[in-house]
Amino acid sequence: MDLEARAHSEHPDELRLWLRMLTCTQLIEKQVRNGLRERFTTTLPRFDLMSQLERAPDGMKMNELSRRMMVTGGNVTGITDQLVTEGLVERVDVAGDRRAWRVRLTVRGRKAFIDMAEQHEHWIVEAFGGLNAKEITQLHRLLGKVKQHSHSPLAEAE
């Protein structure tokens, strides 16, 4: 049973909408996870880490990766260790700080990420295939309003 099925008609529309959004997110994420595993023998966290590094050609410190991915340093270290072993990322010393290093994509890692990112984009476009261009624009605008309200001073004070 998905999350949305837990809501009843007497629940507020906002709660039912929230559960529908969560359900849609989970369904799409499951499709992406399965696709990454089946087509590229990788995981979504590994894809996410490589995505962060693709945006930073000079690499990133581990603590910055952890912050951007919103996961613990231990998680980033474990994923990084796997990717280093596979030759997809490399660790580079940070000048002036013997305790730190930067992580960056290797040439092989960058090529692998580009292949994965192209397919990822295709999966996301496919997931929204039931909507026409106008509906996508409208949904994007409405979710933008939700996002803006969620960042309002009142929401942050709670």
Where do the PLM segments sit?
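C-terminal regulatory/oligomerization modules of transcriptional regulators
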Residues: 1-11, 133-158
